[in-house]
Amino acid sequence: MVRERTKKLRGGHYGRGFKAGRGKGKKGGSGNAGMGKHKWIWMVKYDPLHFGGKGFTSHHISQVEVPINLGDVEYMYESLKRDGFVREENGEIIVDLRAAGYDKLLGNGNFTVKSTIIIDKATEKAISKLSAIGSKIENDGSSA
């Protein structure tokens, strides 16, 4: 009489029925196969960022304003003069902050030199402080 073979639980694939899970045939694909089909629930629970965009790249080139305070203009006055951004025309001192790389004049601090400042934008506080000492602001050829 031949002894019957025992069904050994080979490997870690227990609880899958007779001979199921012993070979390669019932794994549902390897790796990320089936993420959008039969592994969808697993993916939603454990890897929710698997599908979909990861943000976007803005192709709009925005121009960043470079501000400067009145107090900083006072502090940097000599270096601006040395670098050629302060000149004198017809007895009037002209400070060209636009050429120096600044876009906006802010009103923090004090400026004591009576002059014409060339810059694109200025705050109301900066304009009032400059007009109090007799200075003026020009942007694009027109005074502000």
From Swiss-Prot:
GO terms for molecular function: rRNA binding; structural constituent of ribosome. Gene3D superfamilies: 3.100.10.10, 4.10.990.10. GO terms for biological process: translation. The keyword Membrane does not apply. InterPro entries: Rbsml_uL15_N, Ribosomal_uL15, Ribosomal_uL15/eL18, Ribosomal_uL15/eL18_sf. Residues 1-32 are annotated as: Disordered. One of its GO terms (cellular component) is cytosolic large ribosomal subunit. Signal peptide: none annotated. SUPFAM superfamilies: Ribosomal proteins L15p and L18e. The keyword Transferase does not apply. Belongs to the universal ribosomal protein uL15 family. HAMAP family: Ribosomal_uL15. Part of the 50S ribosomal subunit. Binds to the 23S rRNA. This is Large ribosomal subunit protein uL15. The lineage of its organism: Archaea, Methanobacteriati, Thermoplasmatota, Thermoplasmata, Thermoplasmatales. The gene is rpl15.
